[in-house]
């Protein structure tokens, strides 16, 4: 009987110990969960609100100072793809002193400010640790000078107005009229197949936002068809190559009807 009683007491004691461990384990898990929640709330308040502003500023400033001493400071700026954007403009947007912490640079802000330049279509900015900022520019390429409402603009292949400073690009084709900026890329692309003809073309006028008139050297006017004007350009180029365009006293060539061309002389 004494052995049975002793055995029962041991079982009861073991059961009590297991129950206590379970309770302690559950309390521990709850405490950890509560600590995580409190920590998460604190982090959210610290990062996403104005609370602890002075502390944040102090910590960030010290982090920048430490990283600078460790060699993570701005010393080099690499710029690729720059052709027409002024380098000083880029450095001004960068707005950073040499030897300042490279982590202090706000890359998204730099990128957005650079995109404000009408020359820049896209830009990529990154850090190259420990001391370099890399800027890759994708500039808009001017293809023509567009005249509209007595104003002149450089335009790219999408018809986007880049700049009013046309002087450095005076060699580009001059296009005139409503919609001329949008359709200039197609015309320029076709004319580039015939360099001699492109060189003789002074102005391309968009008529009714449907088709083109070309004004050539020698006061010759060419009326192109609304659609499939490539054949008409090929015909004009052939005349030029055979020396039958600029010495025939032509005033106008009406090529709008692909089945019958009309020629007017002075």
UniProtKB/Swiss-Prot annotation:
State any GO BP term from the record: FtsZ-dependent cytokinesis
The residues on the Cytoplasmic side of the membrane are 1-31
In its UniProt entry, the species of origin is given as Rickettsia typhi (strain ATCC VR-144 / Wilmington)
Function of the molecule:
Essential cell division protein.
Q: What is this protein called?
A: Cell division protein FtsQ
Top-level taxon of origin: Bacteria
A Pfam family of the record is POTRA_1
Indicate yes or no for the key word Membrane: yes
Name all POTRA domain ranges.
72-140
Q: Which residues lie on this side of the membrane: Periplasmic?
A: 53-266
Which family does this protein fall into? Belongs to the FtsQ/DivIB family. FtsQ subfamily.
The record lists the membrane-crossing segments as 32-52
Cellular localisation: Cell inner membrane
Q: Which UniProt keywords apply?
A: Cell cycle, Cell division, Cell inner membrane, Cell membrane, Membrane, Transmembrane, Transmembrane helix
Taxonomic lineage of the native organism: Bacteria, Pseudomonadati, Pseudomonadota, Alphaproteobacteria, Rickettsiales
Q: How does it sit in the membrane?
A: Single-pass type II membrane protein
Chief subcellular location equals: membrane
Q: Which GO terms describe its cellular component?
A: cell division site; plasma membrane
Q: Kindly indicate whether the keyword Zinc-finger belongs to this entry.
A: no
The family database entries (InterPro entries) matched by this protein are listed as: Cell_div_FtsQ/DivIB_C, FtsQ, POTRA, POTRA_FtsQ_type
